[in-house]
Amino acid sequence: MSVKWTSVILLIQLSFYFSSGSCGKVLVWAAEYSHWMNMKTILEELVQRGHEVTVLASSASILFDPNNSSALKIEVFPTSLTKTEFENIIRQQIKRWSELPKDTFWLYFSQMQEIMWKFGDITRNFCKDVVSNKKLMKKLQKSRFDVVFADAIFPCSELLAELLNTPLVYSLRFTPGYNFEKHCGGFLFPPSYVPVVMSELSDHMTFMERVKNMIYMLYFDFCFQIYAMKKWDQFYSEVLGRPTTLSETMGKADIWLIRNSWNFQFPHPLLPNVDFVGGLHCKPAKPLPKEMEEFVQSSGENGVVVFSLGSMVTNMKEERANVIASALAQIPQKVLWRFDGKKPDTLGLNTRLYKWIPQNDLLGHPKTRAFITHGGSNGIYEAIYHGVPMVGIPLFADQPDNIAHMKAKGAAVRLDFDTMSSTDLVNALKTVINDPLYKENVMKLSRIQHDQPVKPLDRAVFWIEFVMRHKGAKHLRPAAHDLTWFQYHSLDVIGFLLACVATVIFIIMKCCLFCFWKFARKGKKGKSD
């Protein structure tokens, strides 16, 4: 066979695998830290499937290097903040959040809201820098993207989608009080059995816990509607040239990909345009580096404990570090501790410090017995995926809530970072390692995580491709978005029906009074005769 005909046959075969019509263009509004890591997993899969992905990132973005030879196209827009300034602000606010006094609800959540508003101001300034950049916006319009993809906790993507007349897909873990989910997405969270995120309650609440949950919900609703959204509403109205709100603009999203799952979250109703894709980043463990593998194998039958408080915790106080190190020195297991700071004086021979650890690969190692975690959702999903019981030491944000969920499901023990003693940590580790119930419970969650008809990552990619193929998914969007709040709750209908009932009762009473008056009059007339 000639070279010419061989080439033709190869091209025909390749045409079955690649089709220019099936490849789309995705515009991404960048996120930071763990939010970006989850999005990146989806984006890399989209690139693998032949789609063109453009990430819109500020010049202050921490995780993006325009010179990095990545398959993702990075479109950098200038902003007034420098990368160092932005990183310092984030670390300061996270440090402040983790140190907030938890004595009273009002004090904790009011100060937490201030931190969220600070982040909101920064994000809004980034958004202004984008939409006011006429050259960049013209370039984006010419690119004719098929979909905008973003983490909903960082607003602006919905404004870009509106300006570019492009469908929108959200990825989201949570927002405080489920504010965006409820008021923008129309999600349903009945407070009678769905605990407000960050309340640390379970779905089986006592009467007083339901009262507490209702107060939390009303507090977050009030702060969101009265204070938090005013600046966004004004900004969006100015840019679009018509009165609008953040809730209205976000409510136009075609699909919400929630990074949650039913083995993690408590059951509650979902809308047709919402799908759970929690644990999409989880994957089988890879072999460990040689030195680390040797250390793990040296643990023998006792196994190892993996310890990480995440990338946001640096320069731990010496007193706390020594308390933890002293506890770890007392257990028979070897410990791999992700730690960036001064070496604790009480560090035992069984513990090794690392500035970075391959967490997923360690959790998937057969010798791993327990995971000490701050309660970040990524780490918890990896522990569930590999079936490793946890000791939770939550610090801020959704971490206390995440650990509360794992504790309610019998897969974790919780400790308080500021008050725990060495004895507390030792006892917690002994409990989750030696009590077989914890292993059984987390293995049950693991089996559920693995037993899905379609993997979370494949579902996430499917919905993005679905939106690109059909130029949106408006057929899944509930009509509730088009109703006012009193129409949504049928208050106008209830008012009308009450008015009808009141009118009927009024007429009946009038008739009765009239009849009574008639009979009374006749009686008097008869007596007089």
From Swiss-Prot:
Coiled coil: none annotated. It comes from the Eukaryota. Residues 1-21 form the signal peptide. It is an enzyme of class 2 (transferase). GO terms for cellular component: endoplasmic reticulum membrane. Its EC number is 2.4.1.17. It catalyses: glucuronate acceptor + UDP-alpha-D-glucuronate = acceptor beta-D-glucuronoside + UDP + H(+). Its main location: membrane. It is a single-pass membrane protein. Gene3D superfamilies: Glycogen Phosphorylase B. Belongs to the UDP-glycosyltransferase family. PANTHER family: EG:EG0003.4 PROTEIN-RELATED, UDP-GLUCURONOSYLTRANSFERASE 2B33. UDPGT is of major importance in the conjugation and subsequent elimination of potentially toxic xenobiotics and endogenous compounds. This isozyme displays activity toward 3-hydroxyandrogens. It is principally active on C19 steroids having a hydroxyl group at position 3-alpha of the steroid molecule and also active on planar phenols and bile acids. This is UDP-glucuronosyltransferase 2B18.
